[in-house]
Amino acid sequence: LEDINTKLKERAGELNIEIDIFQSNSEAEIIEKIQSLTSDFTIINPAAFTHSSVAIRDSLVAKKIRFIEVHLSNVFARESFRKNSFFSDVAVGVISGLGPEGYIAALNYINQSEKISR
């Protein structure tokens, strides 16, 4: 996780993007973080909550935050229950199976998207 965070910070610096990295295994803490966000775009790896948390999904939708869903592993190459996501249909995009590079790809997309929308 530290390596991913370091790479993200480095890339964000190159793109002149301010980022806030947050990780929690607590559904309540994740929801509180989402509710406190001031940006309109985020990257989320919901991990096991992908298949179980309507509450996290609802908080993203209620806050009207555009987001990219990222998974380190290819969830479609794993157990069948992992193919169901409560987030994918409301995400701007989904990146799955690219390992840590998925986060960099998401950050690059956000950078490009924000340039276009200005």
Language-model features, listed with the residues they occupy:
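Short beta->alpha linker loops
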Residues: 25-26, 48, 98
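Short beta->alpha junction loops
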Residues: 18-28
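Short, electropositive alpha-helical surface patch
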Residues: 29-47
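Short, hinge-like loop/turn segments at secondary-structure boundaries
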Residues: 37-39, 61-62, 84-89
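Short catalytic helix/loop segments, enriched in acidic residues and glycine
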Residues: 1-13
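CheY-like receiver
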Residues: 33-37, 59, 106
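Short, glycine-/small-residue-rich phosphate/pyrophosphate-handling segment
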Residues: 20-22, 77-118
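Mid-chain, well-packed structural core segment of small domains
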Residues: 41-76
